[in-house]
Amino acid sequence: MIHIATIHWNTERWIDLQQNYLRKHFKSDFRVYAWLNNIPNAPTDSFYYASREPVDSHAVKLNILADIIHASSKREDDVLIFLDGDAFPVGDIETLINEKLSTVKIVAVQRLENNGDLQPHPCFCATTVGFWREIKGDWKEGYRWKNKNGEGVTDVGGNFLKKLTEHDVKWSPLLRSNKINLHPLFFGIYDDVIYHHGAGFRKGECRVDGANIQLKPRDKMLSKFIPGYGRRMRRKANHRLVANNDELSEQVFRTIQEDPRFYTQFM
């Protein structure tokens, strides 16, 4: 049995899309366990389990869903998948999981493109019910790693990376495989089998955009003489980037709705 933990927040528009791609690309039986926040009219009949409890932390919700899955699973070798609500398979994911988990304990997206993030990312992660329990899996942030600029950062999955590192657990990262990139982080294809929209439930702000903001020569000069000027200019530039990202996100979402093979434009 395959058990899938997913979270939808503030909108139900990804639910049917995700379910359709799951049915298309999984041949084995699977159950979906969902956390549905701020979506009072979201349908629940397609989920094996659904919670509407008002929990804010994304990581905590995933951890609780994993506990529920362990309690309902009958086999320690059942496959456990974590999947963001705006992510879904677009290729033969079941074969990939079976092949990878025959040699390693974890297969997960690693978003190196996000300024060098090292941790397994819960937009897609597969392991077994038994191993998650054995290692006391935890999606919360906390453990810090060095990004590509040598800065210490943490994010969701940080504590999971710590456990894998401390126990010397080998895992298989799925890396971004886009041939066409509309954005350096969003609209990602991983190993040609997983699509992750990115920021499908929130504003399109990300660390990699902020790190790449460059002030114009005039603004650089003025920032030397006017306290806080450079910071204000970076904030304005970031607001423009977020607005552009949101507009692009809506355009891509409309394409997803209209074209079941939308992902080929990125491959």
Regions found by a protein language model. Give the residues of each.
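Membrane-proximal basic amphipathic "stem/tether" segments
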Residues: 215-267
